[in-house]
Amino acid sequence: MSYSKQDIERRMEGALASLASEFAGLRTGRASVNLLDSIQVPAYGGVTPLSQVASVTVSDTRMLSVNVWDKTVVGAADRAIRDSGLGLNPVMDGQTLRIPIPPLNEERRVELTKIAGKYAEAARVAVRNVRRDGMDDLKKAEKDGEISEDRHRALTEEVQKLTDAFVKRVDEALKAKEAEIMQV
């Protein structure tokens, strides 16, 4: 039988982890090192993630410091951050870029909550797809005579309970992120 509760849980956890990383990339008006995770810097004859050419730290709630290790890459890192679409304007200070995080206006907050909602819905869909795969495995196992009808029903309920628990966790994560975004 190809059904595995551990596999289903692992895949559902993966959907939640993916949601968490998506949420980390949303600018909430508060400084976070994860805010710059998606930035790619043209360096060394290719495109390199910012985290591989610099260290990012939070100076205070509204300031990030990016310490670029190679001074020849500072300008490229500055341009990459400005062109990222995050609305950030770094200030060069030697090999360090200081990035003030501007407060969000109401319109942008509403827009970010909608984006967060889309990310959460994608996570719910991923969880439901894992449920569907698990249910299909159970149906096949019952059809092939590997499990009884009663065992099939019990395992189906188990998969549904897991799904409900993970969807609830997605909803809780969304509620927390929306509260963080709307906080002035």
Curated annotation (Swiss-Prot):
Pfam families in the record: RRF (PF01765)
Major localisation: cytoplasm
GO cellular component, one term: cytosol
CDD domains: RRF
Name of the gene: frr
The protein's name: Ribosome-recycling factor
Keyword Protein biosynthesis: yes
GO molecular function terms attached to this record: ribosomal large subunit binding
Keywords noted in UniProt: Cytoplasm, Protein biosynthesis
Domain of life (superkingdom): Bacteria
